[in-house]
Amino acid sequence: MSIDLRDIGYRIAQNDHSALKALYDHFSNSFYQLALAIVHSAELAEEIVEDVFIQVWKKRTRVAEIENLQLYLYVTTRNISRSYLRKYKNKNFINFDDVQLPYYKIEV
């Protein structure tokens, strides 16, 4: 599926939430894969993609001026991913789903 990025950019600049959703639906998986390749954490990759689109919305008044929106999103994803790596470089993460919690039987 192809989308008109120039039109999407203009619509986002005019506060069109559906245009942002269309942009997200079109690119989120690709940029998730990019972020995942950089940070090696599904949870962080999801957060990064959310941050990318939040940043687009915060800067929406200038989105129409971006010459190559796809490249802009790619570079933004890469930069935010690298920023997360610096921020969490020495942190160890455990996936909550992998944690074995003790089982307690409660009788009523």
Question: Where in the sequence are the language-model features?
Answer:
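Short, charged helix-capping/linker segments at alpha-helix termini
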Residues: 13-21, 33-51
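Arg/Lys-rich amphipathic alpha helix in sigma70-family domain 2
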Residues: 61-65, 75-95
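Internal acidic/polar
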Residues: 2-5, 91-108
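Residue-level signature of the cytosolic catalytic core of signaling kinases
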Residues: 1, 65-66
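N-terminal module of bacterial RNA polymerase sigma factors
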Residues: 1-30
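Structural recognition of an alpha-helix C-terminal capping motif at a helix-to-coil junction
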Residues: 33, 47-54, 58, 67-79
